[in-house]
Amino acid sequence: MKNWKTLLLGIAMIANTSFAAPQVVDKVAAVVNNGVVLESDVDGLMQSVKLNAGQAGQQLPDDATLRHQILERLIMDQIILQMGQKMGVKITDEQLDQAIANIAKQNNMTMDQMRSRLAYDGLNYSTYRNQIRKEMIISEVRNNEVRRRITVLPQEVDALAKQIGTQNDASTELNLSHILIALPENPTSEQVNDAQRQAESIVEEARNGADFGKLAITYSADQQALKGGQMGWGRIQELPGIFAQALSTAKKGDIVGPIRSGVGFHILKVNDLRGQSQSISVTEVHARHILLKPSPIMNDQQARLKLEEIAADIKSGKTTFAAAAKEYSQDPGSANQGGDLGWATPDIFDPAFRDALTKLHKGQISAPVHSSFGWHLIELLDTRKVDKTDAAQKDRAYRMLMNRKFSEEAATWMQEQRASAYVKILSN
């Protein structure tokens, strides 16, 4: 299940979300700065949204309302893509292939199965790749621009970490859907009142049993509107503070709001709740190593053979590991300490080094191991379980604050970009 913080970045990581068949020259739906949104763009995404909705059993509003939402989404995408072009943001084929492989994996498909499914749904694979590339560029631009505007202070981290440690519901996760009734920059009192009345009307409809997803698609100005407002799973502390406070006593099925923020009025639906315990005890390893780096005077094979010779001398008692490390190791940070790396969690090491280390028993010396640094001889001295409660809570608090502030700032940033762009809608 995707986490809502990923969804807020706007990447449509679902296998059947793509524009349809290759586009031809057609009418312009909107002019966006020095670019355009074509009618075929709108029609393609309309087809995709309807396909997704049909497969998910999601109700949709009338075509005119749906088209408006889709056009606004494409206008915003065009604005951000233009920014990415000016910034020189590129997505390599390797990055794109890895992203698509991850999408296939998330949907429990092989790549061949994904291609077949796209073809079955009438979606062109080449066009699908291009759209995923665009979405990755949009995500990178948004992440870079929004994160530059965010500051997380140490005292904020300490305060939230303390709160996490004392709250009984710190591990509670919620599955939410969201509707945003947007306000323009510097709204008038009349605009605020109109938006509030509309939000209150939507809340009443939702509480009377109206389909929340359809309401989101119809009215919401949020980037997830076309997905029925679905935000997915996340912890309450990861939400903006005004949301977290309103949801502190919420139950499954509750409609919460309207909640006023700087960008408009928010309505939330609690689709589900769950508890998730978090282990904060970690295993640390105490290891030492001898590193030989291949060079013009010592190739890979010679380095490996030299380490085998050193290992044999250690095991026969001709020398000790510490003495050999001081004599031969080319790691300046540990050689003088007899190769001692101190206590650390295995995940800080090079993957090849880490994998070899975690397979060793206490007191065991590895065979020569090749990593990105060279060739290693590794000895596992000891392991221990360490209570990392305080550090884990602070790390968790920092990530929650980043996610919370990103969510708040991203909405403001997108509103600013939309307001400052030249946009002319040419069709209805």
Swiss-Prot record:
One of its GO terms (cellular component) is outer membrane-bounded periplasmic space. PROSITE patterns: PPIC_PPIASE_1 (PS01096), PPIC_PPIASE_2 (PS50198). The keyword Ribosomal protein does not apply. It catalyses: [protein]-peptidylproline (omega=180) = [protein]-peptidylproline (omega=0). Residues 171-272, 282-382 form the PpiC domain. InterPro entries: OMP_Chaperone_SurA (IPR050280), PPIase_dom_sf (IPR046357), PPIase_PpiC (IPR000297), PPIase_PpiC_CS (IPR023058), PPIase_SurA (IPR023034), SurA_N (IPR015391), Trigger_fact/SurA_dom_sf (IPR027304). The PPIase activity resides only in the second parvulin domain. The N-terminal region and the C-terminal tail are necessary and sufficient for the chaperone activity of SurA. The PPIase activity is dispensable for SurA to function as a chaperone. The N-terminal region and the C-terminal tail are also required for porin recognition. HAMAP family: Chaperone_SurA. This is Chaperone SurA. The gene is surA.
